[in-house]
Amino acid sequence: MVRDGTTKSRIKRDIEFLYEIGTLKNTERSWQQFMGSGCASVPEHTFRVMFLALLIARGEKFDDEEKIIKMALVHDVAETRTGDANYLAAVYVTRDEKRAAADTFLGTAFADLYRDVLEEYEERKTSASKIVKDADNLDVDIELKEMEERGSIIARKMEPSRKLIRAKKLYTNTAKKIWDELQKANPASWHLKANKWVKMENAGK
């Protein structure tokens, strides 16, 4: 039971925050301008980034997995207020993501995530921040492969720019190894080859 006004007020602010981050499912990724429909939403992108970041962290023997998960979870939170900006729009549009993120977390139970985690990510100086940024980039490559599997021609045309990302932007050796394997991987093999891992004697009967 809530007894004091300060705590009750804070809970109201936390609920506002929960509604705000819920709107990310309605926030379009701006590269949809180039790729057409079918792009992952911000929360869908964030979900896989968390697993990618954990995968890279384990490959790099980085032990603070709690920080990795928190950082991946909040890395795009500012987009509730700024929206997304693709690589071309970013040349012309200035977004105050730092202020947007600070204001989003202001007065909530999660204010420490901005102060202790998100600022670190944006500065890109620590191992954790580099791991999460690598995950952010790799999710784009995975999604492009999924789009290509569905017949997207523009996804194939993005290959030269993604090779440049691999050469110039990926920080960790683990991320580079994952990128290299992605070029050979079949997005459908997880279910097409399921019998290799799972006994399904009654399949097709």
PLM region descriptions:
Residues 1-205:
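Alpha-helical, largely C-terminal catalytic domains
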